[in-house]
Curated annotation (Swiss-Prot):
Positions annotated to bind substrate: 26-29, 81-84, 94-97, 121
UniProt xrefs under PANTHER family: RIBOSE-5-PHOSPHATE ISOMERASE (PTHR11934:SF0)
HAMAP family: Rib_5P_isom_A (MF_00170)
Protein name per Swiss-Prot or TrEMBL: Ribose-5-phosphate isomerase A
GO terms, molecular function: ribose-5-phosphate isomerase activity
Lineage: superkingdom: Bacteria
Keyword terms: Isomerase
Length: 228
């Protein structure tokens, strides 16, 4: 699996040119991508990056990548991120690492979003992986009940015996809805709930997925079909 992540990372690095301003998401495949960019930076590649998580930022700095503040005016050339699940149409389920809100902000600030993954992340329908939902800690039990009224089973994410705390000082509910037949409708309903900050459904955001398999690298766009 680590070899596939390296393959996807190296393929994605070919998109990065000298002088670019890019977005960096989070997760193990993105971390490998950052390491590849760090190797290129040592060879003279000059780029600037906005990081979606503190872990990504720390790794990027350690690898010699110049981190900049979130852009206020101009768009980033491209953002790179991972995914927990990728369904046809490049519908994504993300947030296993707990950085979904910042990942979505960085993706929205870029001209295009490229997803890095191995073939295990390709699915026919989203939902085998529980849907992360970032929530306000105050009154979280009521928020969980509202989500469960929509048909899900919500579990508070823990770190040891304490709630997991996001970089935004919020909490995460991992919500089991089974197969998500209509991601657009579910995202809209959950996002409307009082106490919900953001969902891990990334819809109509990615323009391409770079997927590594034992047979090589596959470049998947929104209209492409793929075998799961």
């Amino acid at each position: 699996m680590d070899q596939l992540k390296r393959m996807a990372a190296e393929a994605a690095a070919e998109y990065v040119k000298d002088g670019m301003k890019i977005g960096l998401g989070s997760g193990s495949t993105v971390f490998e991508f950052v390491r590849v960019l760090g190797e290129k930076a040592k060879e003279g590649l000059n780029i600037q990056a906005v990081a979606a998580s503190r872990k990504t930022e720390a790794l990027a700095k350690a690898c010699g990548i110049h981190i900049i503040d979130f852009p206020t005016m101009e768009k980033l050339e491209v953002a790179f991120d991972g995914a927990d699940e990728i369904a046809p149409g490049l519908m994504l389920l993300k947030g296993g690492g707990g950085s979904l809100l910042r990942e979505k902000l960085v993706a929205a600030a870029a001209k295009r979003l490229v997803v890095l993954a191995d073939e295990s992340k390709l699915v026919e329908e989203l939902g085998a992986f529980k849907l992360p939902v970032e929530i306000i800690p105050f009154g979280w039990e009521t928020t969980a009940m509202r989500i469960e009224a929509l048909g899900g089973v919500a579990s508070l994410r823990q770190t040891g015996k304490s709630p997991f705390v996001s970089d935004n000082h919020n909490w995460i509910l991992d919500c089991d809805f089974g197969n998500i037949r209509d991601p657009y409708s579910l995202h809209e309903k959950v996002k409307k709930l009082v106490g919900v900050v953001e969902t891990g459904l990334f819809l109509d955001m990615a323009c391409e997925a770079i997927v590594a398999s034992k047979n090589g690298i596959h470049h998947i766009t929104k209209g492409d079909e793929f075998n799961v």
